[in-house]
From Swiss-Prot:
Organs and tissues of expression: Expressed by the skin glands.
UniProt KW keywords: Amidation, Amphibian defense peptide, Antibiotic, Antimicrobial, Cleavage on pair of basic residues, Fungicide, Immunity, Innate immunity, Membrane, Secreted, Signal, Target cell membrane, Target membrane
The protein, known as: Dermaseptin-PT9
Chain positions listed as propeptide in the UniProt record: 23-43, 69-71
Outcome recorded upon mutating residue 66 to K: Important increase in antimicrobial activity (both on bacteria and biofilms), increase of anti-proliferative effects against cancer cells, small increase in hemolysis, and increase in helicity
Domain of life: Eukaryota
Position of the signal peptide: 1-22
Primary location class: secreted
A GO cellular component entry from the record: other organism cell membrane
Stored InterPro entries: Dermaseptin_dom, Frog_antimicrobial_propeptide, FSAP
């Protein structure tokens, strides 16, 4: 009977360790996925800022050209 108890405790312990390792890997994967999503959002934001700056630069250049042309 004692052998059966020890075997059962060993199986339960190994199962808990395995479950703990799986949960840790799952958390790491979720964190990596969140980081990837944040990187994509930042990339999208920077492209919008770049486009806005390009448009503003073209408008300013056009205005300067008009002012120079009037003189």
């Amino acid at each position: 009977m004692a052998f059966l108890k020890k075997s059962l405790f060993l199986v339960l312990f190994l199962g808990l360790v395995s479950l703990s390792i799986c949960e840790e890997e799952k958390r790491e994967n979720e964190m990596e996925q969140e980081d990837d999503e944040q990187s994509e959002m930042k990339r999208g934001l920077w492209s919008k800022i770049k486009d806005a700056a390009k448009t503003a630069g073209k408008a300013a250049l056009g205005f300067v050209n008009e002012m120079v042309g009037e003189q």
